[in-house]
Amino acid sequence: MAEQNILTTPSPNADTTIVPPGSPHTHTEQPSGGHGGAFPPFESHTFLAQLIWLALAFGLLYYLMSKVALPRIEAILGDRAGRLSSDLNEAQRMKAEADAAGAAYETSLREAQAKAQAIAQETRNSLSAEADAKRKTLEAELNQRLAASEATIRARTSEAMGNVRTIAGETASAIVERLTGQAPDQASLNRALDATPAVH
């Protein structure tokens, strides 16, 4: 049986033990106290591949972002901006309506106050005119009653004075007749009564 030579390419970081030909076994061992290889991303001979994969991943991510995520974000932002603009326009419209309603309310309030003052003044004038008319009517009635009362008093006074003159004449005639024994003549009696001061 012919012997064959086994040629192997040792790893840069591996310790290799070469077994001479004729040995039944070939062993590749690492020292028990040794460490493993470097972290793969830090190995210099893989930098180019890593950069290529990084560029591919970045390009794919950029493509996905530009085609999927960014349009959605742009649509959301546009929709939100549209809603904000609509809300602002609605708020401005409502503010304008509120201002107009406030101005109309103030105008109507001023008009109502002016009407109320005019009605109050008209009522006062009407009441004053009615009061003046009633006062004048009462004064006229009182004047008429006073005039009638004065006329009645004068008539009754004249009547009473006439009665007093008659009674006084009769009394004087009786006294004279009693004293002299004869009744006085009417002319002398009237002269005596006329000379007597009137009693009021």
Curated annotation (Swiss-Prot):
InterPro entries according to UniProt: ATP_synth_b/b'su_bac/chlpt, ATP_synthase_B_chain
Membrane topology note: Single-pass membrane protein
Compositionally biased tracts (Polar residues): 1-16
Annotated spans, Disordered: 1-38
One Gene Ontology term, aspect cellular component: proton-transporting ATP synthase complex
Compartments where found: Cell inner membrane
Chain segments annotated as transmembrane: 46-66
Summary of the function given for this chain in its UniProt record: F(1)F(0) ATP synthase produces ATP from ADP in the presence of a proton or sodium gradient. F-type ATPases consist of two structural domains, F(1) containing the extramembraneous catalytic core and F(0) containing the membrane proton channel, linked together by a central stalk and a peripheral stalk. During catalysis, ATP synthesis in the catalytic domain of F(1) is coupled via a rotary mechanism of the central stalk subunits to proton translocation. Component of the F(0) channel, it forms part of the peripheral stalk, linking F(1) to F(0). The b'-subunit is a diverged and duplicated form of b found in plants and photosynthetic bacteria.
Protein's UniProt name: ATP synthase subunit b 2
